[in-house]
């Protein structure tokens, strides 16, 4: 039986979580959230959830386990869920090395859905998330983008995506694009 492992990728504020929530709600696919390891470690170390601490922990985890760290940490959960479901959605796969790890494991069953939004749209969304993960200003936003692209090799998975959805409109447009992608699997 064919398996569908879909990674939703994109820059911060592009709409990855909105896309993932939609797939969870409409299709009932189980989710593996790569960022869970970061939040678990923040809690273990008693650190506040903010951009600086998240970055510190991500770098620490990657220093310990390599650039494919989050994929390595997620693989046991993915394997377990694939015993129960033929479809899984992966949220927040970042690095090229993570992409290669999952691609090597699952081959053609693994697909990437990139969500793209302009920097201005993403900044506005992130400013509206102030309670979740505060962002101070546009300069911090640009620094965060640079760090994610250069420090986590984030561009690779976005560049090789099987489908790119432009998320500049409303949620109905985003949902329609996701439905079209899933129909073609």
Regions found by a protein language model. Give the residues of each.
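Short, well-ordered beta-strand core segments
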Residues: 31, 112, 163-166
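Small-molecule kinase domains that catalyze NTP-dependent phosphoryl transfer to phosphate-bearing small molecules
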Residues: 68, 131-177, 181-184
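Conserved phosphate-donor/acceptor-positioning beta-strand/loop module used by diverse small-molecule
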Residues: 91-92, 105-129
